[in-house]
């Protein structure tokens, strides 16, 4: 049997992934039309067309390659995606500046809304780094992250109002059920900033790192 794989050209459009010899893509008319407008691709050849009963094109069988010089385009796009994003989130009675990587699911505020039905997911960054800067220092004794089934490391660095740094680390084997991982500071700290890093241990970048919620106590 012929090797078949379900998917789209999105991965080839996001990362430079050389096409295999004799690789053929089967796509509907809308996807084919978008392909023709995409400057990243060249040498687009229609090998066959499967028509609907009414005669209109249903699926195109297409071979293609990358346009010359496209690797530089991918490199520039990846460099842009690595630029940290900054949002402001209502948290602990104040507006907090949160620096985070590009996300492809959710808004960064979803990680702090107390709703386990929402989540954030990185587009490709592993670890997921969140830097929170408080305009007014807050008193905290722990941070809890709600995680899923990925084997993970969670690392937290806090800076108190005297400029002292404290580091905490925990590991999680993953679980099919959504569950909390708590890092206890062992004391109440008066904090001006928190850096939370969540790493998916069994994946290399690019990877999707999921975070459902962060709770401060």
Map each language-model feature to its residues.
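Trp- and acidic/polar-enriched beta-sheet ligand-binding modules for extracellular glycan
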Residues: 126, 148-217
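Hydrophobic beta-strand segments within beta-rich accessory/binding domains
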Residues: 26-29, 141-145
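Disordered, acidic Ser/Thr/Pro-rich linker "stalks" and the adjacent N-terminal cap
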Residues: 66-136, 146-150, 213-217
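A general structural motif
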Residues: 20-23, 140, 191
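A generic local structural motif
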Residues: 9-14, 132, 180-183
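Extracellular and analogous surface-interaction loops
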Residues: 130-139, 184-189
